[in-house]
C-alpha cells in the first residue's frame, strides 16, 4: 500500500541544522509516522511546505516531497497583513501536489487538517483522500474572542509598537474568518473523514453529510508512554497547577488569570500556576494582564515558555492537577498526555473535550469562562487528595486504552484499506 501524507509538519525529517526552537505542537504526527514506517508492505511519502529550497529525499523509510515556497518579503507581509489575506488562492500548491501524485502513485492520500493549505487537492484527484480532522476553523472562528472581548479591545494601544502587536490579533481573527469560509466550501468535497470525538463527528456530518467517518485515535509522544501511570501526588507545601497554552486568544489565558486571582483572594491555599508554551514577554500575556488588571506574578502565575516533550513530562509529574481552559478544542493532546501520566485533569466542556473526560470519573469538566466554578473544583482537588488521585487513576485507565499504539495502527491501516477497496484505478489526477 502506497500512502501519501499531506502535512504542515515535516514529521521525522531531519536537517543538518540545529533543532528548531519554538512551538512543539504536531509531535503526534511524528509518533504516528514511527508506527507506519515499521509496517510491512506499506510505503509512506510525506509532503510538507518549506521556505528552504530542498529536493525529494528518502529518510526513515519515508519518501519526503518538500514543496518550496519563497519567504515573503516585508512588503508582501504588509500587503497580506492589511487585506491581502482576503485573496484565497484556490489552486495553491495544487500543481506541485499533482506532480507528486504522478511521481509517487499513491493508493491513498491522508490530508492532515482541513485548515491545511494543501487541502486544495480535495476534488482535484481521483486518488481517494481521507481528511484527518484537527482544529476545525469554523467553530474556532465562532469562539475566537473570549467573553468580554472583541475587535475593539485591540484598537486603543499605548504605543505604535503595541498598535502593530494588537492588530496582529485582529489580523488573526480576520484571517481565520476568511479561511473558515474556504473550509466550508472544501467540506463539500470531502468523501472520507477521520476523527476521534463526538464533536468532530457531528461537525463533519453537518458540513459534509456525504462523507464517511472513521474513528482513529492519536498516538502521543514517546516520553508520555515511558512514564504512563507514574504520577503520584507530590508531597510539597505549595500546590502546583499546570496548563499548556499557545499564544492564541481563545486558549483561555484570561480564565487562568481570573481563576488564579479568585483562588488567591478567596482561599488560604498556597499554590503556583505553571503555564507552559508562552513566555512572560509574549504580547498575549501583556495584553490580557493589562486588560484584566491582573498581573500574573501577583496571583502566583508563572510562565515558563515552550517545553520539549521530556521537559513537559517532568513538569506534569511534579504538579497536582492539569487544567485545560480553552474556549474551543477538538481532542487536545495536552489533556491526553496528562491523563496518560495519571494526573488529575480539569477541562472545559467545549468541542471534543467531553469525549476525553467523563465528569466525575476520568476527570472534571467545567464550562468555558467559568473562573468561579473552576476555583471551586481546584479547591476540591487540593483538599480531597484521595478523590483527585482516583480521578487521575481512572483517567489513566481510559488513556491507556485510547492511545494504545497497536490498536491505533490497526485502525489506521484498516481505514486505509477500506477506503482503497471502495475506489478503483486511483492514480489519475483530474
Functional labels for PLM-detected ranges:
Residues 1-56, 428-430:
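N-terminal subdomain of nucleotide-sugar transferases
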Residues 344-347:
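Short hydrophobic beta-strand element within catalytic cores of glycosyltransferases
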Residues 4, 232-251, 257-260:
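Conserved donor-binding/catalytic core segment of Leloir-type glycosyltransferases
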Residues 327:
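Aromatic "clamp/platform" in nucleotide-sugar-dependent glycosyltransferases that forms part
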Residues 285-310:
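Nucleotide-activated donor-binding/catalytic signature segment of Leloir-type glycosyltransferases, i.e.
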Residues 373, 380, 387-402, 408-414, ...:
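A short, well-ordered alpha-helix in the C-terminal region of glycosyltransferases
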Residues 32, 154-193, 202, 206:
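Membrane-proximal helix-turn-helix segments that form the acceptor-binding/catalytic region
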Residues 359-360, 364-371, 380-385:
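Conserved acidic donor-binding segment of nucleotide-sugar-dependent glycosyltransferases
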